[in-house]
Curated annotation (Swiss-Prot):
Its EC number is 3.1.25.-. One of its GO terms (cellular component) is excinuclease repair complex. InterPro entries: GIY-YIG_endonuc, GIY-YIG_endonuc_sf, GIY-YIG_UvrC_Cho, UvrABC_protein_C. It comes from Escherichia coli O157:H7. Residues 33-108 form the GIY-YIG domain. PROSITE patterns: GIY_YIG. Disulfide bonds: none annotated. Incises the DNA at the 3' side of a lesion during nucleotide excision repair. Incises the DNA farther away from the lesion than UvrC. Not able to incise the 5' site of a lesion. When a lesion remains because UvrC is not able to induce the 3' incision, Cho incises the DNA. Then UvrC makes the 5' incision. The combined action of Cho and UvrC broadens the substrate range of nucleotide excision repair. Keywords: DNA damage, DNA excision, DNA repair, Excision nuclease, Hydrolase, SOS response. This is Excinuclease cho. One of its GO terms (biological process) is SOS response. One of its GO terms (molecular function) is nuclease activity.
Amino acid sequence: MVRRLTSPRLEFEAAAIYEYPEHLRSFLNDLPTRPGVYLFHGESDTMPLYIGKSVNIRSRVLSHLRTPDEAAMLRQSRRISWICTAGEIGALLLEARLIKEQQPLFNKRLRRNRQLCALQLNEKRVDVVYAKEVDFSRAPNLFGLFANRRAALQALQSIADEQKLCYGLLGLEPLSRGRACFRSALKRCAGACCGKESHEEHALRLRQSLERLRVVCWPWQGAVALKEQHPEMTQYHIIQNWLWLGAVNSLEEATTLIRTPAGFDHDGYKILCKPLLSGNYEITELDPANDQRAS
C-alpha cells in the first residue's frame, strides 16, 4: 500500500530540512544569548524585512526555519542585526516601537489607533470615550481598551447578556419610560427597567462585571524609572503616563528623557501595567529637579 503525503506534511518536511542561506551564516556566529531585539534586513537600508524579540536572541533567530514563509523571508534577507536589552520588558518595548517606526514587511503592522476608546461609567450611565479626547492615563472609571466604538459596544452587550442587564438602561437600545424592555419578557433582562430589580442593584452588577476590564490610572505624579537587570547590563526604563520614553544606563541620565507624553500608549500600557504594579522591580520616582525616590 502506497501512503500519500498530505500537503501540510510536505510543508513541514521542507521547513525541517531547510538551512540558513550561505550568505547569512556569518551573522549566526556572533548572535548573543541575551535578551533583546533582532532585525532581518533585505535590500533596503531603511525598511527591515522583520523585527522580533526574545529573551535569547540566538535561540530565537535560529528557530526561524519552522515554516515555508519563514524560509522565504530568509531567502530575501541580506544581513541580521540585533540590539541587546537588560531583559524581556526592554525587548517588548523596543520591538513595539521599532515595528511602529519602521513598518517591516513581514510583521503585523502596528499603527497609532486614532479610534482607541474605552467604556466610562458615570453614576448609572455608560459612555464610550476616546483617547484623543480624554487622558486615559488619568481619567477615572475607564473599562476596557477597544479599537473602535463598535468593539466597545459589543463588549458592553456581551456583559449585558451574561448578567441579564437592561439594554435600555445601558443605552444600547431605546427604552420607553415605565415600560419593560423586550428582553425582560424573554427573561433575558432581570427587570431593572420595570421595577423587578432596583436601579441600584443593576448598577452594582454592572460595575462588578466591568471591574475585570478596569484601566488602571497612572499611580504616580510624574515619570518613574523601572530598573531591569541582566548579568551583563542594567537599564532604567523611563515611563510617564504608561508611555515608554526610552531606556538609559543610569538614573543620572533619566532627566534627559523626561517630557510631556504625546498621549496614552495602548502597547505601553499592556506591556508595563503588570511589571510596574507587581512589586517585583525597583521603581524610582523621577523629579525634574533630580530629587529621586526609590520604591
